[in-house]
Amino acid sequence: MFEINPIKNRLQDVSERTNILRGYLDYDAKKERLEEVNAELEQPDVWNEPERAQALGKERASLEAVVETIDLLDQGVEDVDGLLELAVEEEDQETFDEIEPELAELEAKLAKLEFRRMFSGDHDASDCYIDLQSGSGGTEAQDWTSMMLRMYLRWAEAKGFKVEVIEVSEGEVAGLKGATVRIAGEYAYGWLRTETGVHRLVRKSPFDSSGRRHTSFASAFIYPEIDDNIQIDINPSDLRIDVYRASGAGGQHVNTTESAVRITHVPTNIVVQCQNDRSQHKNKDQAMKQLRAKLFEYELQKQNAEKQANEDAKSDIGWGSQIRSYVLDDSRIKDLRTGIENRNTQAVLDGDLDKFIEASLKSGL
């Protein structure tokens, strides 16, 4: 005899949780909006306004992720229930054995959709920037900053996000003094926002001939890209704009023209840089976009005293504001906020960050 009750209980659980999500994620409204967006994208003149068309395409992908997944879950429950009936009726072990992998796949899809509930912040759906800055530790810290850049790039690419390196500042001997990256994709800021903070590395330094253990620090600061419709008032007299020759991953034109741009907002001392284009004008536009986003985040922090003052934390990158410790000799990476550990240090440095990120989001950080 087949053990059908556990299967029936799991099917009922999937069905009930799907119905909860249907209401929570406003399935009916999203399905109606998806039809409207599809109709608009089918219009022959839609690409007369490229920015509008791109925004619609992004909205469609977001809507489909909810609507199509719920449709698949509904259909999947029906299909598995049908398989169960057939297996029992025909007393067919082979058919019964097909149920477990199909049901497990449904449960995985459901868990992934449920995780979207973590992205409830006002700007979680936005693209974002990652600012990395080396701290205490000299060359070792600068090498650690370059390792962190690689780690986040690997993570983002594995997630299917679009990655753009906006600016890098080379270290004096090796590594990076700092870097800025733009991450574009669904819930990019939602995924990364809890990564803001100081990351501590402990290892035997390749830059120390004695092979001693060194401790070094680098910070990550994550902030959302803001919609052009949001009004951010910037007084031109508050800005100091410097141009310089690009000095890193900027292509063949590096060090040949002063195309790189650095903008300092004097009242807040916020600095943004861009060197990823040949055109000084384009680099200035991108830097201003970053500045608007940083000022927006800065104002949010001022209004919400409970929110960690990330920009202040950047000024003292050391022991005080760590979020994660990477102890390579002991094969141990530990998140100091959630207690989550991973002993596969190479996998983490290769971008396997989901375990840490998901735990921090679930804990409400």
UniProtKB/Swiss-Prot annotation:
One of its GO terms (molecular function) is translation release factor activity, codon specific. The keyword Ligase does not apply. The modification N5-methylglutamine is found at residue 252. Methylated by PrmC. Methylation increases the termination efficiency of RF2. GO terms for cellular component: cytoplasm. Keywords: Cytoplasm, Methylation, Protein biosynthesis. It is found in: Cytoplasm. The keyword Mitochondrion does not apply. InterPro entries: PCRF (IPR005139), Pep_chain_release_fac_I (IPR000352), Pep_chain_release_fac_I_sf (IPR045853), PrfB (IPR004374). HAMAP family: Rel_fac_2 (MF_00094). Peptide chain release factor 2 directs the termination of translation in response to the peptide chain termination codons UGA and UAA. Belongs to the prokaryotic/mitochondrial release factor family. This is Peptide chain release factor 2. It comes from Aliivibrio fischeri (strain ATCC 700601 / ES114). The lineage of its organism: Bacteria, Pseudomonadati, Pseudomonadota, Gammaproteobacteria, Vibrionales.
